[in-house]
């Protein structure tokens, strides 16, 4: 038994309006475009628009030598607590306890080293300006 399309089941192409021909394409674009926009958006933008805390669990201790970057997210409408996220040298992210004394020392040390770098850069700019 074979399935064959009857001639009465066919719709003549001249009787379909241009709108009806474009409807399936418009439908597909309508539902696939937002997905592509969401995938193309940077993760920081997505994280900023989510109204929830990033850190669900925190670590009270970490070796400072493992930290490549440190991000502090202040308390706000997305989360009532301050969040400290450390990006490690192995590309993992760890949430740190901002109230832990060890973490406070690490943050102060990083901020202190940033101030020292800024002073060195300012002195270097002054020296190059005085030489010219």
Curated annotation (Swiss-Prot):
It comes from Mus musculus (Mouse). GO terms for molecular function: chemokine activity. GCP-2(1-78) and GCP-2(9-78) are produced by proteolytic cleavage after secretion from fibroblasts and epithelial cells. GCP-2(9-78) is the most prominent form. A number of additional N-terminal (processed between pos. 41 and 48) and C-terminal (processed between pos. 118 and 132) processed forms have been identified, probably also representing intermediate states. The keyword Electron transport does not apply. Residues 1-40 form the signal peptide. This is C-X-C motif chemokine 5. Keywords: Chemotaxis, Cytokine, Disulfide bond, Inflammatory response, Secreted, Signal. GO terms for cellular component: extracellular space. PANTHER family: C-X-C MOTIF CHEMOKINE 6, SMALL INDUCIBLE CYTOKINE A. SMART domains: SCY (SM00199). GO terms for biological process: antibacterial innate immune response; antimicrobial humoral immune response mediated by antimicrobial peptide; cellular response to lipopolysaccharide; chemokine-mediated signaling pathway; inflammatory response; leukocyte homeostasis; neutrophil activation; neutrophil chemotaxis. It comes from the Eukaryota. Induction: By lipopolysaccharide (LPS). The keyword Disulfide bond applies. May participate in the recruitment of inflammatory cells by injured or infected tissue. GCP-2(1-78) and, more potent, GCP-2(9-78) attract neutrophils and are involved in neutrophil activation. InterPro entries: Chemokine_b/g/d (IPR039809), Chemokine_CXC (IPR001089), Chemokine_CXC_CS (IPR018048), Chemokine_IL8-like_dom (IPR001811), CXC_Chemokine_domain (IPR033899), Interleukin_8-like_sf (IPR036048). The lineage of its organism: Eukaryota, Metazoa, Chordata, Craniata, Vertebrata. Monomer. Homodimer. It is found in: Secreted.
């Amino acid at each position: 038994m074979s399935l064959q399309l009857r001639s009465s089941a066919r719709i003549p192409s001249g009787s379909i309006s241009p709108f009806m021909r474009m409807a399936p394409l418009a439908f597909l674009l309508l539902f696939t475009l937002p997905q592509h926009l969401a995938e193309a958006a940077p993760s920081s933008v997505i994280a900023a628009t989510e109204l929830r805390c990033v850190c669900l669990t925190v670590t009270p201790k970490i070796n400072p030598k493992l930290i490549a970057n440190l991000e502090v997210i202040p308390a706000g409408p997305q989360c009532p607590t301050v969040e400290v996220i450390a990006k490690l040298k192995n590309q993992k992210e760890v949430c740190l306890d901002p109230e832990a004394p060890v973490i406070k020392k690490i943050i102060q040390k990083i901020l202190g080293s940033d101030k020292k770098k800024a002073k060195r850069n300012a002195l270097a700019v002054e020296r190059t300006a005085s030489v010219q």
